[in-house]
């Protein structure tokens, strides 16, 4: 039977000094035999998805102590990708994931915590904490701050549900008046919470449910709704129970690596494909699986993408459908229920709240559940009042969305498409693969071929788009923006948003070794691996080269003869120390970012660090 980790610092004569310090934090004699639970918070006033978390850590802490544990709270950093977007601040977003994972490891191991509750929400925070949970493998429960309410705006006499992306597109649309743009800006982000569409933050919080590490409703119940308080309360009680089951009952089934098994990662990716989640989730699931020492790879994602249908389309893939609408249709448990009925998930996987996922679905899938409380829970509605206060309203819809033929969530028979919402493409320009969010691609451009227009920074591409130098049929190539080449693998949300504003969203393709925001739609292909900075073929593309994209057959090809590509590669290698580097660009790369670039790996491996690279053993 494993001993409580915390006893390293709370038991024995030689730990008198440590106990003295624990006492200075408020612990009493009776506390030294209890599990010490880390409350891993991420409150910050910089991020709307985290601005309301300040008091929620202490809410969880009180429930932990009521259940018989000792709670100790600390915070990680949190970067707002939307505020960091479109300038050099975005270089820091993906690297912050590793810092978050490390900071959790440092705090939990330095103080010998027995278990943890992870309070996350936005883009890199949930993945960073998930990586830490897999790395540490101590009992863990995830609870997020919840989605923002969608904005409501009246334009030309019609009410629209809007979000951050709509504001960005409007700002670049010269046909919109300054007044309408300001109305959109003031309406797009009305409350605290993670941005209201199926962007990266909400995608990851939904996947935490599928992995079995979060409570039902984690991904979909609004940050402002009173129902969300129950998740925090239950998280506090659940983690104490899990800690006791492991340390006192020798029950290893509660550990993150047992809950988030290979099959659970398949479930999460299956959900991701079915709901058309952010392409960033691919990076994060690969990274978390690596921390769990699981052999879960791009090949597994490709395999799943070929058999899983698209059962839901949410902004940005369609307008006017946001997380509040997904919740009304039964949330993530409803999508998992449809996947289960189609035989596409492993329902025997354990979860932190139920013996198996199948047992959870029996209670929480609204097509199966007989519980009136569950049905009431999924009728939670937006309050419609701008606020930064959690749990501030308790409005409910009159009825649920149970339409599985034309509703927000479809059954497999009535799927939006038989192919899912994400796909892996392979070809000479992406030997290790690249990712496209097919849920956001118009059917008319699932196959596409056009001349390349090459840019060696996002900034140059944006200037060309806004300067009307891009025309219908072009394939925009943005390179040297990968994990090493950026460094930091910037998101390309502004280029795709500006293409929309120019009326080119369905007329051009964009290919990059960088990545895309969860708010991106259109023929946007990212994570091209190997990246240009690692000698990838994307580094050899020249203006005018034809690039062909075939999503149905999962192909992407640079249509240039092999001998010509060999000649270009030799020419590049002849540059010596300047080989596989971008032309001069005005970009300050700090020592912190240089350190990240030295250790990071390909997007095909989750862009995680590999210390063997520094030791000369890695690729």
UniProtKB/Swiss-Prot annotation:
Pathway: Amino-acid biosynthesis; L-isoleucine biosynthesis; L-isoleucine from 2-oxobutanoate: step 3/4; Amino-acid biosynthesis; L-valine biosynthesis; L-valine from pyruvate: step 3/4. Its EC number is 4.2.1.9. One of its GO terms (cellular component) is cytosol. [2Fe-2S] cluster binds at residues 122, 195. Keywords: 2Fe-2S, Amino-acid biosynthesis, Branched-chain amino acid biosynthesis, Iron, Iron-sulfur, Lyase, Magnesium, Metal-binding. The active site is at 517 (proton acceptor). Mg(2+) binds at residues 81, 123-124, 491. It catalyses: (2R)-2,3-dihydroxy-3-methylbutanoate = 3-methyl-2-oxobutanoate + H2O; (2R,3R)-2,3-dihydroxy-3-methylpentanoate = (S)-3-methyl-2-oxopentanoate + H2O. Its cofactor is [2Fe-2S] cluster; Mg(2+). Pfam families: ILV_EDD_C, ILVD_EDD_N. The modification N6-carboxylysine is found at residue 124. GO terms for molecular function: 2 iron, 2 sulfur cluster binding; dihydroxy-acid dehydratase activity; magnesium ion binding. GO terms for biological process: isoleucine biosynthetic process; L-valine biosynthetic process. Homodimer. NCBIfam families: ilvD, PRK12448.1. Functions in the biosynthesis of branched-chain amino acids. Catalyzes the dehydration of (2R,3R)-2,3-dihydroxy-3-methylpentanoate (2,3-dihydroxy-3-methylvalerate) into 2-oxo-3-methylpentanoate (2-oxo-3-methylvalerate) and of (2R)-2,3-dihydroxy-3-methylbutanoate (2,3-dihydroxyisovalerate) into 2-oxo-3-methylbutanoate (2-oxoisovalerate), the penultimate precursor to L-isoleucine and L-valine, respectively. Belongs to the IlvD/Edd family. This is Dihydroxy-acid dehydratase. The gene is ilvD.
